[in-house]
Amino acid sequence: NKPWAKNLSFDEFCHYILPYRNGDEDLSDWRSYLKQKYEHLITDSLMQNANTKDLAEFMMRQIRKNVKYGTQFNRLIQGFLTPKETEKLGALECKACANYATMVMRACGIPCEVIEMRWRFTEVPHSSVLFPKTANNPRPFRLTIGDSLTYMGEPKDTMATYRTWAYTYEVNKDLMDLARDKDVPRKFWQPLFRNDVTSLMCTTYDMQLPVPDSLKIKNYLFLCRFDNWEWYPIREGK
């Protein structure tokens, strides 16, 4: 019933607002907790304007008062935490920050999701919050606690990234098929609750590559990049 979400389809609502987890964080009553903490801060002018971009930037400024980006706890905790765990630590790496910001936005009825980008110039991925294209947001963008707003599909991102995932907390059937193949390494399909959104992040191309006869008996083949001392799949083919 929020102005910025009233034109969402049912599928969009289920995908961007309804999910109660982004990953493997402990279950908690985070929605009512964060709604009470943040929703009253939204001004009447923002309510009337219903502009997702302005609202997202305003909410992120409020979020940064409670949680900041920092790397001092990287060796102790990474990934998905409950909101109260995040606030207690105060400064966390990018995935935890994006997870917290996404839950705040969803608690206030703002459609979004966590994305994870693989950069060609660094060995570690980066996470942010994607605000998708909707009736009230004509151009998708990303924004998180440690980064400024950036529209998706900028030329610099095409040069810098090679794969982007969105965490949806719904099982990806294609990844589930990979998991059933005993020849596919576990790290190539875990986690299952994500969808490929690389085409939103950068320009993508179809390629045809010759397959050696010795590999034609395999169900799947992967085009990979050596990243962080291990192979990471850029794209898979069946």
Please identify what each model-predicted range represents.
Residues N1-P3, Y20-N22, N66-V67, R139-K238:
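Alpha-helical and coiled-coil interaction segments, frequently adjacent to or embedded
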Residues S9, S28, S32, S45, ...:
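Generic serine detector
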Residues N1-L89:
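Secondary-structure boundary elements
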